[in-house]
From Swiss-Prot:
Gene name of the record: FERN
Protein name: 3-hydroxyacyl-[acyl-carrier-protein] dehydratase FERN, mitochondrial
Signal sequence residues: none
Organism name: Solanum lycopersicum (Tomato)
Keyword flag Metal-binding: no
FT transit peptide: 1-35
InterPro entries xref list: HotDog_dom_sf (IPR029069), MaoC-like_dom (IPR002539), UPF0336/Enoyl-CoA_hydratase (IPR050965)
Enzyme class: lyase
Length: 165
């Protein structure tokens, strides 16, 4: 089996104390990530998103941006990543997104997922989560709300590796 790092330049951390590893209202999970050219290229190949705003600096400048953009959905993919890292087997039910500002190659983004409400249905939990991404220097770039079905409220240490054969 081959072990691969999903994102070599990402860091997952939690604001929960070591004594309490149960998700509760107000719990915050975060991941820092810096996107590189290779990330945008890989995303484009996978999704067939060939928008020139992501690859052609002149096109991006003509559209009013300072450089090529990181696709918004690539940035937003940090949210399910955080949830899956802490709750293996979680099912992402829904997500709303509001794209506020552009993200450029090399920007360090901090994604945050905060539990807003939690309800138990049989042996599963439905968690409503506030989601946001900010640039390291402060501006909000994406916000929204997610709903996930969790198999447990126990927050596992983040699993950042995948196995492929």
């Amino acid at each position: 089996m081959l072990m691969k790092r999903l994102f070599s330049s990402s860091h997952v951390f939690s604001s929960s104390s070591a004594s309490s590893n149960l998700l509760k209202i107000g719990s915050v999970l975060k991941q820092a990530r810096t996107f590189a050219d290779d990330d945008v290229l890989g995303y484009s190949k996978l999704t067939h998103d060939a928008n020139p705003l992501h690859f052609d600096a002149e096109c991006a400048k003509n559209a009013g941006f300072t450089d090529c953009l990181v696709p918004g959905m690539l940035v937003a993919s940090l949210f399910p990543r955080i949830i899956a890292a802490h709750f293996p087997g979680a099912i992402y039910v829904s997500q709303t997104l509001h794209f506020k500002l552009p993200v450029y190659i090399g920007d360090e983004i901090i994604a945050e997922v905060q539990a807003v409400s939690i309800r138990q249905i049989k042996n599963k939990y439905i968690a409503k989560l506030s989601t946001k991404c900010i640039k390291r220097d402060g501006p909000l770039v994406i916000d929204g709300e997610a709903t996930a079905m969790l198999p447990s409220l126990v927050m596992e240490p983040p699993n950042l590796e995948i196995t492929s054969s």
